[in-house]
Amino acid sequence: MTTALLPTGFRDRLPPFADAAARLEAAALAAAYAYGYERADPALAEFEAGLAGRLKAARAQDAVRFVDPVSQATLAIRPDMTAQIGRIAATRMGHHPRPVRLSYAGPVLKLRASQLAPEREL
């Protein structure tokens, strides 16, 4: 009997694919920087109530939720980074001149996969 090492929808990224993906991400971020975009790295997880309020209903259902052992509050792992970037631009960077130009890249996690998009870790 074979035991799967990773949950459905997850995969290890091995050489040379991990290297190629890193180069592509770096090139995209460098191009954005050349056009005046600053890099932002939002947290992987945040309070579920705040994140769900900024996500569209369908995306909010994709969030993986868990209870934070420190605060005992429900946290959510982002299924999409765009809402977090909006939060950062509106709150933490509220003093910046408008428009705020931010670039971002990083992993997201979906609760469920679909037939057209079987990956859960993107």
Task: Give the location of each predicted region.
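TRNA-recognition modules of translation machinery and tRNA-sensing kinases, especially anticodon-binding
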Residues: M1-L122
